[in-house]
């Protein structure tokens, strides 16, 4: 709320200009309001120890879960928001009442799906492609995540294994296709593919960075990262394998490539396939970072099964939700919050994990 000092400052502006006319004085007051950083930014200063005020906590709750100012019910309880259980009750209420768009935004940001509508495929290789394909795929992804969080109260294992409805996808492109879990979403396949076909390295980096929160070093200076254009003399795996054999690249690619190659049974549009250019698809792979050696699993579904039970995947989901809801990166002081969110995501539900951030003490503090 506006404090006395702010009101007094605006009153001084008005009083100073009032002799020159009412309209000019009022215009100056409005200009001062519009130029204030508080008009553009949600500024949360807290007290000397970084603890937020009751109204700052109310703002954080409402913007984290509904992306809007606090409603009447939240303001009526503002003096009780120091109680974790009260914050949790309001977080769950806000998610249920107005949080569907917030959840869709979170998943799009986490999984890097923003702007997918502009993705296009090479018409020479995918003549069946149209602008409707990425649009419908994004709608399918939104509906999948919304159903998991709000309708099923699904957990981390469900995120990687639940059946994905394909009703809204263009039938001329996806006739007879079935999808299970986030790794089989066509939207994800397109977002990590080239217009001419799949990109195993992009897919492997995506899994490591976005789903496991691993840090990948950039390519060494002077390394050519371009891949030879596709032709029918070699499969995508063969072309990318040759590219990654450079000794300067092997330290990272030994972690990246096995993941990307396991996803090769899904084409650039996310459709299941068993061959490319008439040659069998080799979708053997692994996740060396998790101790799953290269060659020990085959295909997207097998990879999904491993990630579904990996503690690292649960922690990574928790880290991304903490970043999204608090608007900052996590630090070592957030370790117990991340563990609690990950535990709830695995043992109870994704929604419960989302609510858990509001119940944690870190939600009531400004980190410096």
Predicted features along the sequence, with ranges:
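Sequence context surrounding c-type heme c attachment/ligation sites in exported
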Residues: 11, 17, 176-300, 304-308, ...
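Extended, well-ordered alpha-helical scaffold/bundle regions in very large, multi-domain proteins
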Residues: 3-8, 42, 50-105, 119-123
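Extended surface/linker regions that mediate inter-domain or inter-protein docking
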Residues: 27-38, 42, 65, 89-254, ...
